[in-house]
Amino acid sequence: MKIQIHNHTSFKIDSYQQLLIQLFSQIKENNQMHLVFVTKEKIKQLNTFFRKKNFVTDVLSFPNEFSFNPNLKDDSLGDVFICFEQAQLQAQKLLHSLEREIAFLVVHGFLHLKGYQHNNEEELEKMIHLQEKILKKINLERKK
């Protein structure tokens, strides 16, 4: 699967780009997605505008409407926005690497683009299981 990465922050993301390209090369799909790293201010603005939730969040996903209509040809699943600063805070709080946190969030966003939701505990557990299964491909699964 192809991943297009855009950095709209002042943070250096080169090493994370390589990690994510490696991760998504393991996913055998003919689609692509756009990943955009944004600031706290931008993700809060997006969250407020699109979800009516006025706070900073870690990841937002916006599926490409074409992906749900097989008659329209567009290989983009959609866009995933990651707040780099929020990912840093969460990695510190959860006591794992920033690489793992970013990969976890990107995979979470990817699964939302694929139609997965977590509106209840069962759906959340299924999603987390899938995230860990994907992250295991590059040895970033949660350590027990």
UniProtKB/Swiss-Prot annotation:
Transmembrane segments: none annotated. GO terms for molecular function: metalloendopeptidase activity; RNA endonuclease activity; zinc ion binding. GO terms for cellular component: cytoplasm. Keywords: Cytoplasm, Endonuclease, Hydrolase, Metal-binding, Nuclease, Ribosome biogenesis, rRNA processing, Zinc. Its EC number is 3.1.-.-. Zn(2+) binds at H108, H112, H118. Binds 1 zinc ion. It is found in: Cytoplasm. One of its GO terms (biological process) is rRNA processing. Its cofactor is Zn(2+). SUPFAM superfamilies: Metalloproteases ('zincins'), catalytic domain. Single strand-specific metallo-endoribonuclease involved in late-stage 70S ribosome quality control and in maturation of the 3' terminus of the 16S rRNA. PANTHER family: ENDORIBONUCLEASE YBEY, CHLOROPLASTIC. HAMAP family: Endoribonucl_YbeY (MF_00009). Belongs to the endoribonuclease YbeY family. This is Endoribonuclease YbeY. The gene is ybeY.
